Amino acid sequence: LLGLVGSEMCIRDRLYIGFVGSSIYFSAALAALISKIDSQSFAISIKSWVLVSWFFQTVGILVGSIWAYYELGWGGYWFWDPVENSSLMPWFVMTALLHSILVLERRIGLYSWVIVLSILTFTMSVTGTFLVRSGILNSVHTFASDPSRGLFILSFLVLMVCLLYTSPSPR
């Protein structure tokens, strides 16, 4: 618990829960594209997942900002650091997704937008995490430097894409 200001910082995985939650509705969006599910059924099925993800992401950003304000040397609530921005951008997309789902529930419309935002939220979460943890973007959150780390992550991603591309499709 080194460096914690108060009891609210004992649970430090809020942003992670928000990011992982986005993988659920990302998968649902891909499944909806394949199965041609009814648009309103799709909106209802992912609404609670998006809301839970958005809640944890919001709490994570707020508690992190309050912690940064009280921690010496951080200088304020928000520093516009790459790590902070990589959590804020998926939050903006999640907020737009939540609003689009509410519109889609009430009337037919924005189905394509909901699909795109579902995919974009997860993609931004993964890309942001890759950029700040690979060492490509330097930040005040960077505590260790290892130039091979980014190459390892990128190689792993390329390998996974190649395996998925070359695997036989189910019939």
Language-model features: locations:
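Conserved active-site neighborhood of enzyme catalytic/cofactor-binding cores
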Residues: 62-66, 75-76, 82-123, 127
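Hydrophobic cores of alpha-helical transmembrane segments in multi-pass inner/ER membrane proteins
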Residues: 15-28, 87-100, 152-167
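Single conserved hydrophobic/aromatic residue that forms the stacking wall/gate
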Residues: 1-6, 165-170
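Residues within membrane-spanning alpha-helices of integral membrane proteins
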Residues: 19-22, 50-58, 87, 91-94, ...
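Membrane-interface interhelical loops and short amphipathic "cap" helices
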Residues: 7-8, 12, 38, 63-86, ...
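A conserved hydrophobic secondary-structure block that centers on an alpha-helix together
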Residues: 7-8, 12-58, 65
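Cytoplasmic membrane-interface regions of multi-pass membrane proteins
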Residues: 31-39, 95, 99-107, 137-139, ...
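Membrane-interfacial loop-to-helix junctions in multi-pass inner-membrane proteins
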Residues: 34-55, 103-119, 147-151
